[in-house]
Amino acid sequence: MAKIVDIKGREVLDSRGNPTVEADVLLDNGIIGSACAPSGASTGSREALELRDGDKSRYLGKGVLKAVANINGPIRELLLGKDPSDQKALDRAMIELDGTENKAKLGANAILAVSLAAAKAAAQDQDLPLYAHIANLNGTPGQYSMPVPMMNIINGGEHADNNVDIQEFMVQPVGAKTFSDGLRMGTEIFHHLKAVLKARGLNTAVGDEGGFAPNLASNEDALGAIAEAVEKAGYKLGTDVTLALDCAASEFYEDGKYNLSGEGKSFDAEGFAEYLKGLTERFPIISIEDGLDESDWAGWKILTDKIGEKVQLVGDDLFVTNTKILKEGIEKGIGNSILIKFNQIGSLTETLEAIQMAKAAGYTAVISHRSGETEDSTIADLAVGTAAGQIKTGSLCRSDRVSKYNQLLRIEEQLGAKAVYRGRAEFRG
């Protein structure tokens, strides 16, 4: 049995030029596992705490030297000599050492980086691909699937400097036969969308997640541009390709109102649920994430009752990858899907528990990146190893996004005939 002989933390940069945490876990046989923690822009209020230094003289206060010191000090001392393959024991030990509800003492970014680095080291030690090791940890050995990519090709909200209120407009290649075919379809649509926007005299600069970020007349205008790009790429909207939204509604919710400032409109919960329902009737939108504010559970219930039978309603800020909150949502019939983000909860073990709870309740689980990413591609292995069926990892440019797609291509090649791609069957509704 291999043992952990050293743990090293360091400050590196994410895709927005902000510091984040990287950790190395070294084993007594020379194996090293490395992982980085991502960072979000639109964040749920109940997410685990990302520990920042607050020193305005360094990185505008966003340095992570405190989190790095926690890795190189107490976390290292805690885990030296431990078995890297006992993921649950490692994660529980770090959580207990932290001792807070939201990992505020050590930092979720510190705990997560070590948690993922240990998993990578353990996978190498067992001569397993990371996705296979994750499947074993998940209690589903050998059960894999290739996820349907939800490709964010128009960025708005907190992910772009434009007038579009809805944060993400995504395409899903549900009619593809394989993941690689689906990726090709999405890429072709992305390039056709650039031409569509250029023909309209619109900006084709990209946002945080690699999608285009033009000023548009309305959210519906964004959907119309994508529909045109799908057609020009030679695909049938609603059959080959479907659409998805991430409203990130908490970002434009204030005093009980949903304010679409880009359109000059304001709604109460009932009205905004009706607005979203209208969009699903005019476009083949099969998934809506954070359609209402994270605290507006009454509004979420209205939305779920209105369109939950035919549309996947994903809780991101709503559930923050937290089993306690998810359990309450399941009991109250709120939404029908959970977005899974490692750093919202802060460890691999707790992430797997959230996926398991969702699946047991008939909810889908969508594996997701953050807007502040690195070259770390662990979420690709997580999606395959848990057979989650769906992944959100941005658009078709920027290496911080493409690194995940490229890892999925490698995994598909490794799995061969076992690389099942289920397309539309992965979605609720």
UniProtKB/Swiss-Prot annotation:
It comes from the Bacteria. GO terms for cellular component: cell surface; extracellular region; phosphopyruvate hydratase complex. The active site is at 209 (proton donor), 341 (proton acceptor). Pathway: Carbohydrate degradation; glycolysis; pyruvate from D-glyceraldehyde 3-phosphate: step 4/5. Keywords: Cytoplasm, Glycolysis, Lyase, Magnesium, Metal-binding, Secreted. Its EC number is 4.2.1.11. (2R)-2-phosphoglycerate binds at residues 167, 341, 370-371, 392. Its cofactor is Mg(2+). GO terms for molecular function: magnesium ion binding; phosphopyruvate hydratase activity. It is found in: Cytoplasm; Secreted; Cell surface. It catalyses: (2R)-2-phosphoglycerate = phosphoenolpyruvate + H2O. Binds a second Mg(2+) ion via substrate during catalysis. Mg(2+) binds at residues 246, 289, 316. Its main location: cytoplasm. CDD domains: enolase (cd03313). Pfam families: Enolase_C, Enolase_N. InterPro entries: Enolase, Enolase-like_C_sf, Enolase-like_N, Enolase_C, Enolase_CS, Enolase_N. GO terms for biological process: glycolytic process. Belongs to the enolase family. Component of the RNA degradosome, a multiprotein complex involved in RNA processing and mRNA degradation. Catalyzes the reversible conversion of 2-phosphoglycerate (2-PG) into phosphoenolpyruvate (PEP). It is essential for the degradation of carbohydrates via glycolysis. This is Enolase.
